[in-house]
């Protein structure tokens, strides 16, 4: 019998604690072993049972989540998923938490439409499973499919002809998930100011991507911004897909631009790496350079294979530097990867491929 992932929920809202408990109780892989209204109660709970994953609110009375997180990571590291409200302060605190060692960010569940609750449940459960795998690499529980895992066909039909206009301008597409916030910082800070245009999908909740892009923009030599529909791809700039919208690469004449679109979850995600990669295969072909980075699941693997078949240069982050070696591993297994490299070597390899 598959081993349950033990979850401890720490949030000062009784409604949030109950909602999360209900969500996890519906997934056979997850088991709530305790709830706590603040970090002091959480410590008491952990004296009797050690969880595999802690779901942690940031803003709490008596001791805030960031202080508790730092204590956990310094004394007894446990994978932590930050459960944050959608506010500017919440987003900033969440990214601070990622710097302190948290592995995922999720948006607090809220009562809304049936579709929102279903999709929110999928994302929350997947985030906890990914966090557990970041430490428990040998975890072998069979994935519980809540909804069908759609392919990129749901957003962009496969291109039978693959008639890509040949151009000399290169464009870079990148996909990441669990552990990607820190990995993308390392990648983009190493990019030269005149680097080729970059489009990025990082699995992240709605409203958090703008703050994430802003933080990167303040530390990188290139411009980093959340993508808007119709943005033209420019050298020295990286565009990050908005949370809850798919990002597609398009071309008009000699210019690349991006399109942001609503649509179903693809590979259980929106935005989806597969959607971005398929659009790059269609509109850039062998003028694209693609990188797939740390993350759980298989989003991006099929799209990278399509890019590889058009002649694009494809790179996967290696297992040693991934928080979760899921997405890169699936891409390698499909045979769509030209090179497997450590995180610190990705930027130079991308620039070299674009200049060759």
Swiss-Prot record:
Q: Which residues form a coiled coil?
A: none
Q: Write down the EC number.
A: 3.1.1.61, 3.5.1.44
- Residue ranges constituting the Response regulatory domain according to the UniProt record: 6-123
Which transformation does this protein catalyse, written as a reaction? [protein]-L-glutamate 5-O-methyl ester + H2O = L-glutamyl-[protein] + methanol + H(+); L-glutaminyl-[protein] + H2O = L-glutamyl-[protein] + NH4(+)
Where 4-aspartylphosphate occurs, the residues are 57
One GO cellular component this record assigns the protein to is:
cytoplasm
The text the record gives for the protein's domains is: Contains a C-terminal catalytic domain, and an N-terminal region which modulates catalytic activity.
Please state what the protein is called: Protein-glutamate methylesterase/protein-glutamine glutaminase 2
């Amino acid at each position: 019998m598959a081993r349950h992932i033990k979850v401890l929920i720490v949030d000062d809202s009784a409604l949030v604690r109950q909602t999360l408990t209900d969500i996890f109780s519906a997934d056979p892989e997850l088991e709530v072993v305790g709830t706590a209204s603040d970090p002091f109660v959480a410590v008491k709970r952990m004296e009797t049972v050690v969880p595999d994953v802690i779901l942690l609110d940031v803003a709490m009375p008596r001791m805030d989540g960031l202080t508790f997180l730092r204590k956990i990571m310094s004394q007894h590291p446990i994978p932590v998923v930050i459960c944050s409200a959608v506010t500017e302060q919440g987003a900033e605190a969440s990214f601070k938490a990622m710097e302190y060692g948290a592995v995922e960010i999720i948006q607090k569940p809220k009562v809304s439409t049936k579709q929102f609750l279903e999709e929110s449940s999928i994302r929350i459960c997947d985030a906890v499973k990914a966090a557990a795998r970041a430490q428990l690499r040998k975890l072998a529980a069979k994935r519980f499919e809540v909804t069908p895992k759609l392919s990129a066909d749901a957003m962009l039909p496969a291109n039978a002809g693959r008639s890509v206009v040949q151009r000399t301008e290169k464009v870079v597409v990148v996909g990441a998930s669990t552990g990607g916030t820190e990995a993308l910082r390392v990648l983009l800070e190493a990019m030269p100011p005149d680097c080729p245009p970059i489009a990025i999908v990082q699995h992240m909740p709605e409203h958090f991507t703008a703050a994430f892009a802003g933080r990167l923009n303040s530390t990188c030599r290139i411009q980093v911004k959340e993508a808007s529909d119709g943005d033209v791809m420019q050298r020295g700039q990286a565009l990050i897909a908005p949370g809850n919208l798919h990002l597609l690469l398009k071309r008009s004449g000699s210019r690349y631009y991006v399109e942001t679109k609503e649509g179903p979850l693809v590979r259980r995600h929106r935005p989806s790496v597969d959607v971005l990669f398929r659009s790059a295969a269609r509109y850039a072909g062998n003028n694209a350079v693609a990188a797939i980075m740390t993350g759980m699941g298989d989003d991006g693997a099929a799209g990278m294979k399509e890019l590889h078949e058009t002649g694009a240069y494809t790179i996967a982050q290696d297992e040693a530097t991934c928080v979760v070696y899921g997405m890169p591993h699936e891409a390698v297994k499909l045979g769509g990867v030209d090179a497997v490299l450590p995180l610190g070597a990705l930027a130079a390899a991308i620039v070299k491929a674009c200049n060759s």
